[in-house]
Amino acid sequence: MDPNCSCPTGGSCTCAGSCKCKECRCTSCKKSCCSCCPGGCARCAQGCVCKGASDKCSCCA
């Protein structure tokens, strides 16, 4: 389960604008789900992997 969300790891969720999901795929938020993703990344909602705040996430590299 995602520590920042109520959905299972790898699952899909529909979070509010303050989405902080890291282990699941948020399908509703327009903001970055990973802290290292740029806010305008259109592919973040498809799921991304973040190794650290200063790293680039896998979907927006």
Swiss-Prot record:
Which residues are noted in the entry as a divalent metal cation 4-binding? 33-34, 44, 48
Where is region (Alpha) located?
Answer: 30-61
Q: Which UniProt keywords apply?
A: Acetylation, Metal-binding, Metal-thiolate cluster, Phosphoprotein
The function of this protein is: Metallothioneins have a high content of cysteine residues that bind various heavy metals; these proteins are transcriptionally regulated by both heavy metals and glucocorticoids.
Q: Where does a divalent metal cation 2 bind?
A: 7, 13, 15, 26
- Assembly information from the UniProt record: Monomer.
Q: Which residues bind a divalent metal cation 1?
A: 5, 7, 21, 24
What stretches pass through the bilayer? none
Q: What is this protein called?
A: Metallothionein-1A
Which terms does the UniProt entry file under GO BP? cellular response to cadmium ion; cellular response to copper ion; cellular response to zinc ion; detoxification of copper ion; intracellular zinc ion homeostasis; negative regulation of growth
Which positions are annotated as binding a divalent metal cation 7? 50, 57, 59-60
Q: Which residues carry this modification: N-acetylmethionine?
A: 1
The protein's matches in InterPro entries, at most eight in alphabetical order, are given as: Metalthion_dom_sf, Metalthion_dom_sf_vert, Metalthion_vert, Metalthion_vert_metal_BS
Residues the record lists as binding a divalent metal cation 6? 37, 41, 44, 60
Q: Where does a divalent metal cation 3 bind?
A: 15, 19, 24, 29
To which species is this protein native? Equus caballus (Horse)
Under Pfam families, the record lists: Metallothio (PF00131)
- Record-listed Phosphoserine modification sites: 58
| Entry remark concerning the domains of this protein | Class I metallothioneins contain 2 metal-binding domains: four divalent ions are chelated within cluster A of the alpha domain and are coordinated via cysteinyl thiolate bridges to 11 cysteine ligands. Cluster B, the corresponding region within the beta domain, can ligate three divalent ions to 9 cysteines.
Q: Tell me which residues bind a divalent metal cation 5.
A: 34, 36-37, 50
